[in-house]
Amino acid sequence: MALMLSRIPRRFFFLFLTVGLIAGAFLYSLIYFVDVDLVSKVNQLYDQQIAPMLSDAIGTPSVNHSFELAPLDSHLVATSTTFHEASYESEPQQNPASQNIVLLLVSDGHTSYNNGANTFEEAIQNRVDYSTKQNYNFEYVNVTGLPIPAVWSKMPAVLQTMKKYPKAEWIWLLDQDAIITNTHLSLQDSFLKPENLQKTLITNTILTKRPINANGDLRYTPSNYSLKDIENLMVIISQDHNGLNAGSILFRNSPATALFLDIWTDPVVAECAKANNEQDMLGYLISKHSQLASLVGLIPQRKINAFHEGPENMEWQKGDLVIHFAGCWVENRCDELWQKFYALID
């Protein structure tokens, strides 16, 4: 081939090259402007053929098998402290087993706008008490030294915790500015048992306010969930009036979740998404990628993320598991609200 090309006069070579480039540009324009359904056809091919193969490759998660995560980048490894280790002496009475749940606090010792320093020890104690009562593991990851903002450090901290607890099934990431108010209520009894989760998941509801296309269409949760669908969920989260709220969120410990988290923290993707925080980034990912959206389950806010004020479906009521003081800094009421509800812990 090289010999044949060398025999072609230079002027003809450049002529052929120019014609080829023009033809390529014309073909690209034809596809782009005439076959407007091409993108949808490719997406359909992905959903029907490629995605199932990816699903088969990832497999369904199981607490009976642990997996090895790739090492984190060294600059994203933070100090991790186990404040409570679950007991494995007794037979599991719940599904998932209590000892396979990790309660995780990721913090630099502060909450939004430098609040929370004087309530940090109480936040730790609250989680120790709850984990002890429910036989969960409780892990604290101190992200003070990480070279990224605290809200972006959550995802590598979850990955780090997944690596530390390879046999754990679920990791519950709960922000520092939240109090577990009902320590008698387990996650399993509240919603995490597969049969309970099937009843609790919100259906036919907008999953994110970010449009999925130029027409402004939105992505919705499924109309129903089978138990098989439940097994494939990797993230459980709730919404507030602004959209998805990552102040209280659960991650299934699986290779699919690890990949999800790795993409979630990608700075290049975050720049493309124009995401100001981890919640914006999550909204972008599930609006643009149907396969990632299928991994996310939406549950009522008061199940894991009740607020101190708001409409009935949002505002904390006695017996609720958690209260989250999101936005308390706006009126400088964080310490006041903390002390008020800390006294109501049951």
Curated annotation (Swiss-Prot):
Localization annotation: Golgi apparatus membrane
Q: Which GO terms describe its molecular function?
A: alpha-1,2-galactosyltransferase activity
Stretches in topological domain Cytoplasmic: 1-11
Origin, by domain of life? Eukaryota
Which residues face the membrane's Lumenal side? 33-346
Q: Name one GO cellular component term.
A: Golgi membrane
Q: What EC numbers are recorded for this enzyme?
A: 2.4.1.-
Which principal EC class is assigned to this enzyme?
transferase
InterPro entries linked to this entry: Glyco_trans_34, Nucleotide-diphossugar_trans
Sorted UniProt keywords:
Glycoprotein, Glycosyltransferase, Golgi apparatus, Membrane, Signal-anchor, Transferase, Transmembrane, Transmembrane helix
* Glycan-modified residues: N64, N142, N224
State any GO BP term from the record.
Answer: protein N-linked glycosylation via asparagine
Q: Which family does it belong to?
A: Belongs to the glycosyltransferase 34 family.
The record's annotation in PANTHER family points to: ALPHA-1,2-GALACTOSYLTRANSFERASE GMH3-RELATED, ALPHA-1,6-MANNOSYLTRANSFERASE MNN11-RELATED
Q: What is this protein called?
A: Probable alpha-1,2-galactosyltransferase gmh2
Instruction: List the lineage, top down.
Output: Eukaryota, Fungi, Dikarya, Ascomycota, Taphrinomycotina
